[in-house]
């Protein structure tokens, strides 16, 4: 995982369905190349292989619910993700929470397969517990702010700061990123100033009238943040 990073979660938005997922990913790819920054996209499972085959930037899966491929109807296994072209996976998003034992298995399994592993958590202490599992990054996202336009970096900066302090002190090799309500370049800049190494966002980019321009705005603060 190249840091700092902007991760765009397509969720199941109609604006990022089918060919629109590729168009959105290509807009992100264009910005990444023009600015020289790290941008990853997380399309819906249905579009994952299509997007992965269409762009050169990192493509992450939005989640997983089976460790190994096999007779699991309507499930998605870690092996399936890798075969589809994913290079990373987001785990334990508040919209797709996991039991601790499953989360631990998926973190270990994902890393063993060479996937970037990002674990979401709602608060500093849970983020610390998630970091103990050894992912590449934890994304602290207060669920009450997700999708509200009220950026965590402005409305709950203490949550971000505490998470950075705890994780950095105990698991310095685990990056802290943040999300929830991120809508603007200013929000991203504020998050980076608080000590994070990136942001995870969705609707700000996916629902933008001009995704390219919006992603450009959101990604520009990464340039100044520079490598670790």
Swiss-Prot record:
Keywords: Cytoplasm, Gluconeogenesis, Glycolysis, Isomerase. Pathway: Carbohydrate biosynthesis; gluconeogenesis; Carbohydrate degradation; glycolysis; D-glyceraldehyde 3-phosphate from glycerone phosphate: step 1/1. Substrate binds at residues 9-11, 146, 181, 202-203. GO terms for molecular function: triose-phosphate isomerase activity. One of its GO terms (biological process) is glyceraldehyde-3-phosphate biosynthetic process. The active site is at 93 (electrophile), 141 (proton acceptor). It comes from the Archaea. It is found in: Cytoplasm. Disulfide bonds: none annotated. The keyword Isomerase applies. It is an enzyme of class 5 (isomerase). It catalyses: D-glyceraldehyde 3-phosphate = dihydroxyacetone phosphate. Its EC number is 5.3.1.1. InterPro entries: Aldolase_TIM (IPR013785), TIM_sf (IPR035990), Triosephosphate_isomerase (IPR000652), Triosephosphate_isomerase_arc (IPR022891), Triosephosphate_isomerase_AS (IPR020861). Pfam families: TIM. CDD domains: TIM. GO terms for cellular component: cytosol. Belongs to the triosephosphate isomerase family. NCBIfam families: PRK04302.1, tim. HAMAP family: TIM_A (MF_00147_A). Homotetramer; dimer of dimers. Involved in the gluconeogenesis. Catalyzes stereospecifically the conversion of dihydroxyacetone phosphate (DHAP) to D-glyceraldehyde-3-phosphate (G3P). This is Triosephosphate isomerase.
């Amino acid at each position: 995982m190249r840091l700092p990073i902007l991760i765009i979660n397509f969720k199941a938005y109609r604006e990022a369905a089918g060919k629109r997922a590729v168009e959105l990913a290509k807009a992100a790819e264009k910005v990444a190349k023009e600015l020289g920054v790290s941008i990853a996209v997380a399309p819906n499972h249905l579009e994952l292989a299509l997007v992965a085959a269409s762009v050169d930037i990192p493509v992450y899966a939005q989640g997983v619910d089976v460790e190994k491929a096999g007779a699991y109807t309507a499930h998605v296994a870690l092996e399936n993700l890798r075969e589809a072209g994913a290079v990373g996976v987001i785990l334990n998003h508040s919209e797709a929470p996991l039991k601790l034992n499953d989360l631990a298995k998926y973190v270990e399994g994902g890393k063993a397969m060479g996937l970037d592993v990002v674990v979401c958590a709602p608060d500093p202490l849970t983020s610390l517990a998630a970091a103990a599992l050894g992912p590449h990054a934890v994304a602290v996202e207060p669920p009450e702010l997700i999708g509200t336009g009220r950026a965590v970096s402005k409305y709950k900066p203490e949550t971000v700061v505490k998470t950075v302090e705890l994780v950095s002190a105990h698991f310095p090799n685990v990056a802290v990123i943040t999300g929830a309500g991120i809508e603007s370049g200013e929000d991203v800049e504020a998050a980076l100033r608080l000590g994070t190494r990136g942001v995870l966002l969705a609707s700000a980019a996916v629902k933008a009238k001009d995704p390219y321009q919006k992603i450009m705005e959101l990604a520009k603060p990464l340039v100044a943040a520079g490598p670790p």
